[in-house]
A protein has these predicted regions:
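Secondary-structure boundary elements
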Residues: 1-54
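Small-side-chain structural scaffolding
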Residues: 25-28, 74, 79, 109, ...
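Residue-level signal for well-ordered alpha-helical scaffold segments within enzymatic catalytic domains
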Residues: 30-31, 65, 69, 113
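His-Asp-centered catalytic microenvironments across diverse enzyme cores
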Residues: 15-20, 37, 81-204
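Active-site neighborhood of thiol-dependent amide/isopeptide-bond enzymes
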Residues: 42-100
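Solvent-exposed, well-ordered amphipathic alpha-helical segments
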Residues: 1-2, 23, 71, 115-120
């Protein structure tokens, strides 16, 4: 089922889009970016859209499919990284204390988007943090401008391109197992606490 009409209908119902307003790549980016950072019941694009929430994986799986429907080829990227006091100074005290004890390993998703299929030019797109997270000094991307790379929501250690014929979530889970190792449960608790803090601070 095409996702762009579903996005338009859900965004209109929520008062985020004017009736009849056209969904462009920039509009799709804005709507997905501003979904609350919170895990949906699963990461299927339809679920993320229906529940209007997602973390970096669900948001970018949805945004990839939307952009492809709008004519822009897009590829899921996986990046290993760590939350530290130095690269995440915006963390609240209880989470800052956690990363000072030891960095929290994580695996992040973002996109590479072919914004000009004729010229073959690609750009980095990251819709992880809602725009309102800027007031918490988080690195949210405010605009989608063709040809302008967006800031990645982490400091990548290693980057992997997901092949078109591979399940991105299965690949991500393998990389989480390798990167987080025995800290996988700690990582999971950290992401849950981060989502709860953002829900308290930003609403949604």
């Amino acid at each position: 089922m095409p996702l762009v009409p579903l996005l338009r209908d859900e965004a209109t119902r929520r008062g985020l889009l004017d009736a009849g307003e056209r969904v462009t790549p920039a509009v799709a980016f804005r709507l997905v970016r501003d979904m609350p950072y919170r895990r949906a019941s699963d990461r299927q694009p339809e679920t993320v859209l229906r529940e209007w929430q997602g973390t970096c994986s669900g948001k970018h799986y949805l945004l990839r499919d939307l952009l492809q429907e709008l004519g822009l080829p897009a590829t899921i990227i996986i990046a290993t990284h760590e939350f530290t006091a130095e690269n995440a100074p915006w963390l609240p005290p209880h989470l800052a204390t956690e990363v000072r004890l030891a960095p929290v390993p994580d695996v992040h998703n973002f996109l590479r988007v072919q914004h000009d299929p004729v010229a073959g030019d690609w750009m980095t797109v990251d819709a992880t943090w809602p725009a309102v997270a800027r007031r918490l000094e988080m690195p949210a991307n405010l605009s989608f401008r063709p040809g302008v790379d967006q800031k990645i929501a982490c400091d990548p250690i290693e980057i992997f391109h997901v092949p078109d014929d591979e399940d991105p979530q299965a690949m991500k889970e393998r990389i989480i197992s390798e990167h987080a190792g025995g800290q996988a449960a700690r990582r999971d608790l950290f992401i849950t606490a981060l989502s709860r803090w953002l829900a308290t601070e930003l609403g949604g």
